[in-house]
Regions:
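Active-site phosphate-binding strand-loop segment of PLP-dependent enzymes
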Residues: 1-70, 76-78
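PLP-dependent aminotransferase class I/II
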Residues: 7-11, 16, 20-22, 29, ...
Length: 250
């Protein structure tokens, strides 16, 4: 945090809230705004309060891969500040309150009617899908424990006070890329979120970071692997996923 810092943007990664008590405390002492990146955390909560109301502004995504996904791109911002709400509403329509009169440089960020219609239908199923994902996460915990793979596979941990919605079920493993190729051969889908840390992205080269600047992030990027977690996943399918991972490490 420097004199140029205006806001802090914590990310509720994979469906679990960041430590908002600590982050909000730091921000308050420094006079900063806090913007929640809750794109992967719709329905998540911390100490009984939902993601999206834990800071000044909450940001959600309705990209099709999210727990509540549309038929294309879309999103939502939340705030209990009337002034911020008015400013955000203006920015989403080209910086305009009155048609063809622009008070600021804005963007075209309106949710189109098709996306709204799809989301309206799907919204009533969100809690059901969330419970399915949480059930499957608990089942993975049991299956990996029974398979005696906890020395090979580091499972996700839910921080006390958090309600995890498992947008992804992300484990950490050695030989990640080899394991992923093996699972693909066995018909098991997986994804890597994310393969390259932010400080090593080309767009940030001018900041002077290099490999070794953030070794914890770099190691995580080499080990993370997201396994199937969608609500309709059966116990037999999950058992097969775990069985194949066990077969790889034997």
């Amino acid at each position: 945090i420097t004199s140029r810092t205006k806001a802090v943007i914590p990310v509720h990664l994979f469906g679990q809230c960041a430590d908002m008590t600590a982050i909000n405390g730091i921000a308050k002492r420094r006079g900063l705004r806090v913007i929640e990146d809750a794109c992967q955390a719709i329905g998540a909560a911390q100490n009984g309060r939902r993601a999206g109301i834990l800071a000044d502004v909450g940001c959600f995504s309705f990209f099709p891969t999210k727990n509540l996904g549309g038929f294309g791109d879309g999103g939502l911002m939340t705030t209990d500040n009337d002034g911020l709400a008015e400013a955000l509403a203006m920015l989403r329509v080209h910086g305009s309150r009155v048609r063809y009169l622009h008070e600021a440089v804005g963007i075209n960020s309106r949710l189109d009617a098709l996306q709204a219609a799809v989301l309206h239908v799907k919204l009533k199923y969100l809690d059901q899908w969330t419970e399915g994902r949480r059930r499957n996460a608990d089942r993975y915990q049991r299956l990996f424990t029974e398979a005696q793979l906890l020395d090979r596979v580091i499972l996700p941990v839910t921080t006390p006070g958090n309600f995890h919605v498992y947008n992804q079920y992300t484990v950490r493993v050695r030989q990640r890329d080899d394991l992923r190729n093996f699972l693909k051969e066995k018909g098991v889908g997986s994804e890597v979120y994310y393969p390259l840390p932010m400080h090593l992205q080309n767009c940030y080269r001018d900041l002077g970071y290099h490999k070794g600047s953030f070794p914890v992030s770099e190691r995580a990027a080499e080990e993370v692997l997201s396994l199937p977690i969608y609500a309709e996943l059966t116990e037999e399918q999950q058992a097969y996923v775990v069985q194949m991972i066990g077969e790889f490490y034997r």
